[in-house]
Every structure is written in structure tokens, then in C-alpha cells.
Amino acid sequence: MRNAAPAHQAGFAALLCTIAFSAASGAATAAADELQALPQTRSIYVEAGYTDHRGPATRTRTVGLRVPLQYSWWQGRIRTHLDVYLSDWASTAAPPARRHNTQLGVVPMARYRFADGQSPWFVEGGIGLSYLTATHHTPNGPFGSRWNFSDHLGVGRNFGAQRQHEVSLQAKHVSNAGLRKPNPGETFVQIRYAHRF
């Protein structure tokens, strides 16, 4: 009978540990599920920036729509979306450079969240296509094509009770990858604000 008490105590301790582990796992799963559900809604964004070279600069203002895609990897830490945007490029280059040019773009993006997908911080990147409504001139010459690749890389953070606000720093390179000469390209640094709805 002396051994019965320690055996019961060990069994009771094991039961408590199992309950505690199950509760913690359930809470962690619920938190992860809640966070993973957040990016699956559309958002609109505005951003502004300028080219990274010295001399005559090109400033850009953009309005865009982010549409979630149903692809994710690494237990939801990497999620995908589609950026569809309209940009105004304002150039200070000398004639024959056009003062304003409009860019239409579509870029599939992949976003990685830190801390097993639960962090408000993220990095993202993607490569897509864009179209300029007129030939764009840079200090190094004109673009050889109106159709270009658009490479995006960003880092940012979500805010708010439902993480509905987002601020990020974006780097974007636009060029035709040498498919048509000349190909000076432009690289922009931009600040973005997005709101999820």
C-alpha cells in the first residue's frame, strides 16, 4: 500500500501535464490560426518614393490592391498574394523626357512572417510585369520597351487590434532584363501604407 500513493501521485502529475500541454497547444494553434486568417483578406495601399540615383530623379506615387492567393508553405509562415497597381512617374529629366508617365503592374508576391508565422514583422518579394503608357527617359537614356519586368522586395510591420494597418519599406526595380536595348532600368525606394478590409 505504501507504493500506491506515489503511483497515484505520478499518474495525477502525468494527467496534469497532459492537460496543461493540450491547453497550451490548443491556445497556440488558435493564435496561429487567427493570425494565418488575417492575411487572407484584400487590402488597398498607397505608396510614394523616388529613384535611387543622383541627378534628375523620378518620383512615383502608387495606389494598389493586394488580392490573397490560396497558396502557402512552411505551415503558413509563407503566404502569397497578387499586387495590382497603378503608378504615376514624375520625371525631372530634360526633354525629350515626358514629365509624367503611367505604369500598370501585376506582381505575384510571397510574404514570410517571423516567429513561426506569428510575428507582425514580415519580408516579401516578387517578380511580375508592368506596362508604361509612354517611353520613359532616365539620365542614362530611354527605356527600350514599354513592357518591363518589375522586381519587388519589401520589409514591414502590421499594427492595430486586428493588424489591419501595415507600413512597409519597398525597393522596386523596373527593366526589360536586357530583352530590348537600351535597358537603363529604374530602381525606386518607396514607403507604403496598406489597410486590410
Please state what every model-predicted region is.
Residues A37-P39, L153, F159-F197:
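Predominantly the C-terminal beta-signal and adjacent terminal strand-loop region
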Residues M1-L38:
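Cleavable N-terminal export/targeting peptides
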Residues V46-Y50, V63-Y71, V106-Y112, G125-L129, ...:
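Residues on the lipid-exposed face of transmembrane beta-strands in outer-membrane beta-barrel proteins
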Residues A48-R54, V84-A90, I127-T133, A171-A177, ...:
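Transmembrane beta-strands of outer-membrane beta-barrel pores
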Residues Q40-V46, G76-V84, L104, W121-I127, ...:
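Transmembrane beta-strands of outer-membrane beta-barrel proteins
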Residues Q40-R42, A57-V63, R98-V106, S145-D151, ...:
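Residues that define the transmembrane beta-barrel architecture of outer-membrane proteins
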Residues A28-T41, L69-R79, A115-W121, A161-Q164:
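Short loop/turn motifs that connect adjacent beta-strands in outer-membrane beta-barrel proteins
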Residues Y50-D52, A93-A97, H137-F143, N176-L179:
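Extracellular loop and loop/strand-boundary signature of outer-membrane beta-barrel proteins
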